[in-house]
Structures are given as C-alpha cells and as structure tokens.
Amino acid sequence: MMTAETKGRAACLIGWPAAHSRSPLIHHYWLRLHGIAGGYNIEAIPPEGLAEFIMHLSTHGFVGANVTIPHKERALQLTAPDERARAIGAANTLYYDGKTLRSTNTDVEGFIGNLDAAAPGWDRTGDALVLGAGGSSRAVVFGLIERGIKRIHLVNRTMERAQALADQFGATVMPLAWSGLGDVLPRAGLLVNTTSLGMKGQPPLDIELPLLPLDAVVADLVYVPLETPLLAAARARGLRTADGLGMLLHQAVRGFELWFGQRPAVSPELRALVEADLRIPHPAT
C-alpha cells in the first residue's frame, strides 16, 4: 500500500508471488529525473484478493498499476480494456480515465519501440518469423500487424496453438511446423524468439542462422541472460539484434506517461542502471 515514503502520485506492480522486479528501479529513476513527487511499489496480491484490490486501487493510494503473472488475464476482465489488451487477451497496465479504471497492454509498444531504437528500418526487410505462440507472441504479432508487416510466419512445436493464433489474427499470420523453418528463414527479414529457449536454465534455441538474409534483424524477448545464445550467434554473423531488456524498458514508457503525465526516454544511463541490477543475484520474495 502507499506509505509515507511514497508521498504524491504512486503506482504499483501487482503480482503473486511478488518476485524481484526491475520496474521500481525504472520508474523511480524517471521520477527523480523529472522531479516528480511519487513512488512505485510492489504489491503481492493472491488470486483470491485480486478483484478487491483492483476495484479499490485508488482507495489503496494508487493512480495506476502494472500487472504481472498470474493476474494479466483476470485484470483484463476486471477493467475496461482497449483494443490491444482485448486482442492480446491480457492487460499489463491499469490507469484511471476519470473514475473509470482502464487497461492496456504495453508489450506492443515495448516490442516495436525497442526494434525502432535498436534496428531502424527493420520493417522494410521481408517477412517476419515469430517463434512461439504464447502470450508474448500475441503482443508481438499484434504489433507487427499494426506496423504493416504483410507476412508473419508463426512457428510453434504444438501446431494447434499456432493455428489458433493465426485464426484470431487473420490471413497475415501463417502457422508453420517447426520442421518447416528451413523453408522460411531465407526470406525472413525479422526473426523473433518469444519462447523461453535460451533463458538462463533453459536449453539454447537450435536454429540455422546462416539461412537468414545478411540484412535480417534478430530479436529475443529473453533478458536473462542479457545476450542469449541466439543473439550472440546473430551478432557474430553481423546481423542486427534487439534484446529483451530493451523491450522491458520501452514497455514501461507508456505506463509512466499515463500515471505521471510525462513521457520518459529510454536513455543509455537507465539501461546501464538496469544492466547493473541484472548482474546482482536477487532471491525471490
């Protein structure tokens, strides 16, 4: 809840359990930079207490919130979602519009904003190839369609999940079995990994990067480790890359703007601050 240490406007992160998050570090950096009196807390809310907490968010002292696992789908149902949140099926940012508590999903802006910053012109180079068909994949696909990408190949080990997502988003999205990767890689201007493969403790992603065009961009939503084996291999081949930390930073921009009235920038200083935090072991809380 809001405390004496968070006088002024305050937002929070709602999750269960409340594991270590970099969101307070990011938002407190921006609050200091813009001279705004306020704060950003972590609130550990169990599923059975979520509805009460969200319905009385302002009573608890908050002007808005981020939502993380396992609450994103339920938060969508408890608020007034925008088109993005409805299409993705999950809300990660809550804010007040008058007395109405609205929700959106800023993963789209995080993904696209990161690509624009890390690889300008990425959207002018061929088809997009997306690996994985989970919640993160929905945000990626929505963003690619919104940007105007005409052909999105969606690869998943479970073909039924890829087909279901393709059915939702229409003819632009073409489901593909993992065995068909080799046929699509030569014409993919953008490769996006939305799976957990390559994450710390997970096996690396096995993919034939030499088949990609030399001007292709490779993006990975994983940010621990900061440079996944996929990104390291892509960089070694001279391909442009976009890492998961960049997406994390860019997705936070819109929430801060909605809550505190200033649109912050993702600066090298902020990135260095979060990179330093990533190198520190943090036990789950």
From Swiss-Prot:
Catalytic activity: shikimate + NADP(+) = 3-dehydroshikimate + NADPH + H(+)
Family assignment from sequence similarity: Belongs to the shikimate dehydrogenase family.
EC number: 1.1.1.25
Binding-site list for shikimate: 21-23, 68, 92, 107, 223
GO MF terms, alphabetically ordered: NADP binding; shikimate 3-dehydrogenase (NADP+) activity
Keywords: Amino-acid biosynthesis, Aromatic amino acid biosynthesis, NADP, Oxidoreductase
Domain of life: Bacteria
Descriptive protein name: Shikimate dehydrogenase (NADP(+))
Pathway assigned to this chain's UniProt record: Metabolic intermediate biosynthesis; chorismate biosynthesis; chorismate from D-erythrose 4-phosphate and phosphoenolpyruvate: step 4/7
Chain positions recorded as NADP(+) binding sites: 83, 132-136, 156-161, 221, 244
Active site, UniProt feature: 72
Subunit structure comment from the entry: Homodimer.
GO BP annotation list: amino acid biosynthetic process; aromatic amino acid family biosynthetic process; chorismate biosynthetic process; shikimate metabolic process
Biological role stated in the UniProt entry: Involved in the biosynthesis of the chorismate, which leads to the biosynthesis of aromatic amino acids. Catalyzes the reversible NADPH linked reduction of 3-dehydroshikimate (DHSA) to yield shikimate (SA).
Entries under Pfam families matching the protein: SDH_C (PF18317), Shikimate_DH (PF01488), Shikimate_dh_N (PF08501)
NCBIfam families: aroE, PRK00258.1-4
GO cellular component: cytosol
Gene giving rise to this polypeptide: aroE
